[in-house]
Curated annotation (Swiss-Prot):
Catalytic activity reported: L-histidinol phosphate + 2-oxoglutarate = 3-(imidazol-4-yl)-2-oxopropyl phosphate + L-glutamate
Cofactor(s) the protein requires to work: pyridoxal 5'-phosphate
Enzyme superclass (EC): transferase
Keyword annotations of the record: Amino-acid biosynthesis, Aminotransferase, Histidine biosynthesis, Pyridoxal phosphate, Transferase
Top-level taxon: Bacteria
Subunit structure: Homodimer.
Name of the protein described by the UniProt record: Histidinol-phosphate aminotransferase
Pathway terms, separated by semicolons: Amino-acid biosynthesis; L-histidine biosynthesis; L-histidine from 5-phospho-alpha-D-ribose 1-diphosphate: step 7/9
Gene3D superfamilies membership: Aspartate Aminotransferase, domain 1, Type I PLP-dependent aspartate aminotransferase-like (Major domain)
Length: 359
């Protein structure tokens, strides 16, 4: 066979995959820091002891203890819960289950979480965007104009990276607008920091509502990769058709079940109270620093702030081993950096470094 006609392995890949820009996760961005404040992780580890030793057997697809414990915690029925490899897998499952590649679309409202677009582009589903209003609330009129052909809409509340809650009345309007035509997904990865705002109680009113959750943030288990999809049973049954046979390993299911016991949930709430105190300390300090132009209100475990010369500030802290998340490329976030709320020692490192910046 002539080598002139031989295509490279890359040429054999799907065109949309060749053109794809992978999600820039905190670890993928690299860096040699010792103060990691760019992934909204909990700053200290939580210890568990494995109780399941049956590693010679395949795990359950949906481990009973995990499902039942999460249902109890979230106030829903076990049949309304699906567990997956992080909420990111939930995003992908929803697109695969509801969107016809090349024909239908998802919609989301930037600035927001980047995995909605990455998952849709990987699968070959059109991605539509309607930027938020100046206050980062939903542009309902703009959404209405773009809904034709949309099967799944993602709304992150509290929103990453801006930190604010989406107006609940706007969410109700959106749910009425999409009834019978599209699934509305409320991404509640950070809801433990403002639990009163959850939409889980709305599932009985809206058959097309889906809520995404995770153990990565307030439960301090980012390394576990364990997330949840809350929805009506009709939706859950569809997702069970497309999920992998064994999404959770036995050790992951073991630790997740322990984290979701009443004792585990109480420990999580104590951690949240600690983070909220630390958040206020950091906010108060940031407001007094010369290079900080604005500190935005947050309902989460991170703070978005606008800086003078943000790129040089970001690099300066990076060089000192303090890794933040640069948000300059997101719509309406020029000059903005996102700072995870860490320990008091980590907060002080950030504060001292920023105070030393020459502006």
């Amino acid at each position: 066979m002539s080598t002139e006609n031989t295509r490279s392995v890359t040429d054999l890949a799907r065109e949309n995959v060749r053109n794809l820009t992978p999600y820039q996760s905190a670890r993928r961005l690299g860096g040699n820091g010792d103060v990691w404040l760019n992934a909204n992780e909990f700053p200290t580890t939580v210890e568990f002891q494995l109780t399941q030793q049956t590693l010679n057997r395949y795990p359950e697809c949906q481990p009973k203890a995990v499902i039942e414990n999460y249902a109890q915690y979230a106030g829903v029925n076990p049949g309304q819960v699906l567990v997956s490899r992080g909420a990111d897998e939930g995003i992908e499952l929803l697109i695969r289950a509801f969107c016809e590649p090349g024909k239908e679309a998802i919609l989301y409202c930037p600035p927001t979480y980047g995995m909605y677009s990455v998952s849709s582009e990987t699968i070959g589903v059109e991605c539509r965007t309607v930027p938020t209003l100046e206050n980062w609330q939903l542009d309902l009129r703009g959404i209405a104009d773009k809904l034709d052909g949309v099967k799944v809409m993602f709304v992150c509340s509290p929103n990453n990276p801006t930190g604010q809650l989406i107006n609940p009345q706007d969410l109700r309007t959106l749910l009425e607008m999409t009834r019978g035509n599209a699934i509305v997904v409320a991404d509640e990865a950070y809801i433990e920091f403002c639990p009163q705002a959850t939409l889980a109680g709305w599932l009985s009113e809206y058959p097309h509502l889906v809520v995404l959750r995770t153990l990565s943030k307030a439960f301090a288990l980012a390394g576990l990769r364990c997330g949840f999809t809350l929805a009506n049973e009709e939706v859950i049954n569809l997702l069970l058709k497309v999920i992998a046979p064994y999404p959770l390993s036995t050790p992951v299911a073991d630790i997740a079940a322990q984290a979701l016991t009443p004792q585990g949930v109480n420990a999580m709430r104590e951690r949240v109270a600690q983070i909220l105190l630390e958040r206020q300390y950091l906010v108060n300090a940031l407001k007094e620093i010369a290079c900080v132009e604005q500190v935005f209100d947050s309902e989460t475990n991170y703070i978005l702030a606008r800086f003078t010369a943000s790129s040089s500030v970001f690099k300066s802290l990076w060089d000192q081993g303090i890794i933040l998340r640069d948000q300059n490329k997101q719509p309406s976030l020029s000059g903005c950096l996102r700072i995870t709320v860490g320990t008091r020692e980590e907060s002080q490192r950030v504060i001292d470094a920023l105070r030393a910046e020459q502006v």
